[in-house]
Every structure is written in structure tokens, then in C-alpha cells.
């Protein structure tokens, strides 16, 4: 029997979406050959250090953990427009990612999603698309309405989120729009 704590990490694993755009993931999986349940988290953040602690925890306990960059930021291809490709439009990156993960040789076909904030919102957009292999979703928190102008969201989190988005935006028009929103918030 393989020790539970033995796992491997495959970096920058490509998956091709329905429109031909390639998104990249870091895949943490048990070292022992086999087919395992998969947990997917889709983010617009750098994958390395943010996901490692709990990705390793899940992989060492018999799960495959897929941390994927959304379309556009970091290694993933395509134009980055926040949340535009996560739901039920022409490009359904969330749906395609779930079905891609289910078809991999290390997957037993049971795929779940997890986490909050950006990842929580991508789950909210994924849910109505109903991928056949999506068995569970764990959203620990995500804003229902990103544009609210009340409370802590407006005071602290919203400007912080916008600054993070500017740093990660690769499309000039998206970056300019975010800058104008930050200027409005700070005035």
C-alpha cells in the first residue's frame, strides 16, 4: 500500500477549451497509479504558493487537485475579461474544465469544485451549466453582487480587488476600465 502522503505535482498542464484556447493548470495527484476523485479550483491568481498548502493536503489524502488559471491571466491563453467565460455563454470554460478533468487517466469521473472569493464566483457561474461529471461544489464564500456599494466591500475589499485585477489584466481596455473605477473609488 502506498503511503497516503506521497503525491506528485504536474505544472502547467494544458487543457483546450471548446474555442481552441488553451488554459493551464497545476495538477496535484497521488503518486500511486489509479483513478481518483478530482477537486477543481479556477482562479485568476498565480497558482504556485496560493494553492500549494491545501492542494498538497488533498493530494496526500487520495484526491487529485486541479488549480487552473482562468482565461487570460498568467499562463492561460486568451483575452481576460473577468467572469465572462465562466458561465453559460459561448465560451464555457468552467464546464469544459470539469469535463476535461473527468476524462483524464487519473480521474474516476467524479469532479467537485471548491473555495471562495474569485473561485466561489466562478462556481456560481458554473452551476447552471450542469456538467455531467460535476458531483459537488463547496463554495465557502463569494459575493452575490460584485457591484454593491455598501459596507466592508466598498471600504476595503473592492479597491483591493480592483488593484489586483489591474495587475493581472493583460488586455489594455480592461486595464484602462479598471483604472478608471479605482480613480472613482479613491475620489
Residue ranges and their predicted role:
Residues 1-34:
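N-terminal cap/lid segment of alpha/beta-hydrolase-fold proteins
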Residues 1-11, 37, 49, 69, ...:
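Beta-propeller folds
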Residues 22, 35-38, 61-64, 107-110, ...:
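Loop/turn elements at helix/coil->beta-strand transitions in domains of secreted/extracellular proteins
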Residues 30-103:
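Cap/lid segment of the alpha/beta-hydrolase catalytic domain
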Residues 60, 128-187:
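Accessory cap/linker subdomain of secreted extracellular hydrolases
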Residues 66-67, 115, 139:
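Hydrophobic residues in well-ordered beta-strands that form the structural core
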Residues 105-118:
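Alpha/beta-hydrolase fold nucleophile elbow
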Residues 118-131:
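Short glycine-enriched nucleophile-adjacent loop
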Amino acid at each position: 500500500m502506498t503511503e497516503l502522503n506521497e503525491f506528485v505535482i504536474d505544472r502547467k498542464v494544458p487543457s483546450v477549451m471548446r474555442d481552441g484556447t488553451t488554459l493551464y493548470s497545476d495538477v496535484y495527484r497521488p503518486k500511486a497509479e489509479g483513478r481518483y476523485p478530482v477537486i477543481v479550483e479556477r482562479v485568476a491568481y498565480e497558482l504556485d504558493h496560493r494553492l500549494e498548502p491545501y492542494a498538497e493536503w488533498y493530494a496526500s489524502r487520495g484526491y487529485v487537485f486541479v488549480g487552473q488559471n482562468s482565461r487570460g491571466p498568467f499562463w492561460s491563453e486568451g483575452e481576460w475579461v473577468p467572469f465572462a467565460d465562466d458561465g453559460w455563454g459561448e465560451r464555457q470554460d468552467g464546464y469544459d474544465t470539469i469535463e476535461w478533468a473527468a476524462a483524464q487517466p487519473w480521474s474516476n469521473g467524479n469532479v467537485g469544485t471548491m473555495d471562495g472569493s474569485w473561485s466561489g464566483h466562478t462556481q456560481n457561474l458554473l452551476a447552471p451549466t450542469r456538467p455531467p461529471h460535476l458531483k459537488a461544489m463547496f463554495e465557502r464564500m463569494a459575493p452575490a453582487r460584485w457591484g454593491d456599494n455598501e459596507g466592508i466591500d466598498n471600504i476595503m475589499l473592492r479597491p483591493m480587488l480592483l488593484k489586483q485585477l489591474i495587475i493581472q489584466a493583460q488586455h489594455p481596455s480592461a486595464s484602462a476600465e479598471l483604472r478608471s473605477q479605482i480613480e472613482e473609488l479613491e475620489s
